[in-house]
Amino acid sequence: MIENKPAKVLFKTIMPVLLLITLVISFDLFFPPIALSDLSYNNVMYKILTDFFDVIILIPFFVFCLSKHLFRFTTHRRCLVFLLLFLSLVFLLLILYNFSLVNVYAAFYYLIVIAFFEEITFRGYMFTVLNQHFSFNKSVVISGIVFGFSHGLYSFLLFGTSIFSVLNFIGGGIIGSYIFSFIYVKTKSLVFPIYFHALLDFCGFVLF
């Protein structure tokens, strides 16, 4: 069913996400995050605390989404359970491939701080709500634009990247949105896009 007032739907759906992103960026501007490549035993507690508060910011949003029954974490099919176990094994092997404090923390970071946060926000909430009013493709593109824009804005404000790089992030955000939304729709669970998202980021960090 197509919504008669798409602009109103977009506004009501996008604004909570922009508010959430604004809170995260504001916190990280006051307490600059430590890059994983700079992590050491001397600063690991600071890294844990700042990442912890980034996750805390998500909790009210997460509870709201659960109260509306917007998404599920279940894995009913046996083959999906085996896939989940396989992805967990890949995570473990990547950590053991080059065992270090940085890689162990990176596995946690990409799974909980990055993938869990982003998939709940952009797939569990934003894509799900949009897809109740718009087609799959429109929902993917809209959520992907916001997904990429938030990454580009974060990178620009905290790491000083070019403002034009935001366009690259938006393009990548749309591609990522297609991949993760497709997995979400096919599995009917956020578990798999979260795991796959984290695995892609973690592989990129460990191998490249």
PLM regions: where:
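Membrane-helix interfacial "entry" motifs
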Residues: 5, 9, 39-43, 47, ...
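Transmembrane beta-strand segments that form the barrel wall of outer-membrane beta-barrel proteins
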Residues: 89-92, 111
